[in-house]
Curated annotation (Swiss-Prot):
Record flagged with keyword Coiled coil: no
Key word Membrane present: no
Lineage: Bacteria, Pseudomonadati, Pseudomonadota, Alphaproteobacteria, Hyphomicrobiales
InterPro entries recorded: Ribosomal_bL33, Ribosomal_bL33_CS, Ribosomal_bL33_sf, Ribosomal_zn-bd
Keywords: Ribonucleoprotein, Ribosomal protein
Protein name: Large ribosomal subunit protein bL33
Annotated gene: rpmG
UniProt source species: Rhodopseudomonas palustris (strain BisB5)
Family assignment from sequence similarity: Belongs to the bacterial ribosomal protein bL33 family.
Length: 55
């Protein structure tokens, strides 16, 4: 069996609220860590989310 191209990652809020999104990314085309600006409902504003591994 071949190795999967897409992997699941966790986007953790930089506002230190503990909130995170789970998404997937293509590991071949996006080799660097993903960062996105998304809504954090705990902080009730848009903040930067950084990639972390799912344990």
């Amino acid at each position: 069996m071949a190795k999967a191209v897409t992997i699941k990652i966790k986007l953790v809020s930089t506002a230190d609220t503990g909130f995170y999104y789970v998404t997937k990314k293509n590991s071949r085309t996006m080799t660097d860590k993903m960062t996105k600006k998304k809504y954090d409902p705990v902080a009730r504003k848009h903040v930067e989310f950084k990639e972390a591994k799912i344990k």
